[in-house]
Regions:
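Helix N-cap/coil-helix junction residues
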Residues: 22-23, 41, 74, 130, ...
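Hydrophobic transmembrane alpha-helices of multi-pass small-molecule transporters
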Residues: 1-60, 64-66, 176-306, 322, ...
Length: 423
């Protein structure tokens, strides 16, 4: 059995275990990565390489910032203000939190946005007396959809643009992706205020013990104006800095500085900071990063795309080709990191489009949007993974509303892309 087939078999088994849900997701992710290393698909170092990477540091640091928001009472204060504005209805809370997430994720890391908003959404839900778990799926998905408003909304957008421009093809300006991204955001809001809301798991499945630990403050401690002010200032600085993050000042480093300031000023103790980190979430991200690497280096991802290309034949219909590119990219991004997905499919599909006299920019736009649609699995994106523990969410909780959203995203995109970028 070659490396590509081995990887696909292991991924299939992992998917089944994700669906069944009897084994913790973090254990499944790490076991899959370790097995791939034992079979020689990836190196032993690859299994743990993500744990020294920026994503893991960013996740851990933002979890600490979120804990500080609760410990200083900032989350409660913000939630109190927002509940007065939105009311205590589920629709009001979804509308408010999703709108903010959509806008912020257009210029900031989706993972950073969810990590920052998670404590506020939890506090709002608890104050309003609505299900915490039902608010987390729309929040997570919004952070993925919102990145389609600008070209810098996601690293995968920037990667796609770079790969296409390296081929000598002029791609998009800063806001041009928003021609499709803005209608998608509107459709997203309408979806979760109507049909999507009904597809969310009924009741509150959230981990009450975890939420109690996550949201508690010191007994009898009142809101501290000084420490609360420091916490808000640090949060705003992190948010602004993320907009201007670059290779010299990456987002994970900025978030780490924020954590150091919060601990140094007493907004959070060292022990509280350590307890704030949800280690199972980090193991899921780390393990799936290794699996994503295996999909790339083994040729498993290319095997899937080659199969699709062979099905299309030598002279496919232009709309059919666009639909296939979108579908394949969207399916892959639920199994691989979105940046890995675009690095795989862009060099394959764009030259084919050029050879078939199909507008390569339209194909690039489809790749950007589809790569930011990880709605089918809890491990498709770091934003999804962040919500697993507090919401006690499983595969079905993501797949059921995510399937409808995937269909909607694809339908809207396939209608609008040929209008703005004729095939």
């Amino acid at each position: 059995m070659n490396a590509a087939v081995t990887t696909l078999v292991i991924l299939a088994v992992m998917t089944v275990l994700f669906v069944v849900g009897t084994i913790p997701l973090g254990l499944v992710s790490m076991a899959g990565a370790i097995l791939l290393a034992c079979l020689g698909v990836i190196t032993k170092a690859d299994v743990f390489s993500a744990f020294s990477g920026g994503t893991i540091v960013l996740l851990g640091a933002m979890m600490m910032v979120g804990q500080a928001l609760f410990h200083t009472g900032v989350a409660d204060k913000l939630a109190e203000i927002m509940v007065k504005i939105t009311g205590t209805t589920e629709n009001g809370i979804i509308l408010a939190t999703v709108s903010v997430a959509l806008l912020l994720s257009s210029i900031c890391s989706g993972v950073g946005v969810v990590a920052m908003m998670l404590p506020i959404v939890i506090a709002m839900s608890m104050k309003a007396g609505v299900s915490v778990s039902r608010q987390l799926i729309p929040l997570s998905f919004a952070a993925s959809v919102g990145c389609n408003l600008t070209l810098i909304g996601a690293a995968s957008n920037v990667s796609t643009a770079g790969l296409i421009e390296d081929m000598g093809i002029k791609f998009l300006t800063f806001f041009e992706l928003g021609k499709v991204g803005l209608p998608l955001c509107i459709a997203f809001l309408l979806y979760f205020l109507t049909i999507g809301k009904k597809l969310l798991t009924p009741g509150d499945t959230s981990d009450k013990a975890y939420l109690e630990e996550y949201t508690k403050r010191e007994p009898g401690k009142k809101f501290d104006n000084v420490k609360g002010g420091i916490c808000i200032t640090v949060l705003i600085c992190i948010l602004v800095a993320m907009v201007f993050a670059n290779s010299q000042w990456p987002m994970y480093f900025i978030a780490a500085i924020g954590c150091v300031i919060l601990i140094a000023t007493g907004c959070l103790s060292e022990s509280q900071a350590m307890r704030a980190v949800d280690w199972p979430t980090l193991f899921i991200v780390g393990g799936m990063s290794a699996v994503s690497k295996a999909m790339s280096v083994s040729g498993a991802g290319k095997m899937i795309t080659d199969f699709v290309v062979s099905m299309l034949g030598t002279s496919p219909n232009k709309m059919m080709f666009l639909a296939f590119v979108f579908l394949v990219t969207m399916l892959l991004t639920n199994m691989m990191m979105n940046t890995s997905t675009v690095v795989l499919v862009t060099p394959l599909f764009v030259p084919i489009a050029v050879a078939m006299n199909i507008n390569p920019v339209a194909i690039g736009v489809a790749i950007c949007i589809a790569a930011s649609a990880p709605f089918l699995t809890p491990v498709g994106s770091g934003t999804n993974t962040l919500c697993i523990r507090p919401g006690n969410l499983g595969f079905r909780d993501f797949f059921v509303p995510g399937f409808g959203l995937s269909v909607l995203t694809m339908a809207v995109s396939l209608v609008l892309i040929p209008i703005f970028w004729p095939l």
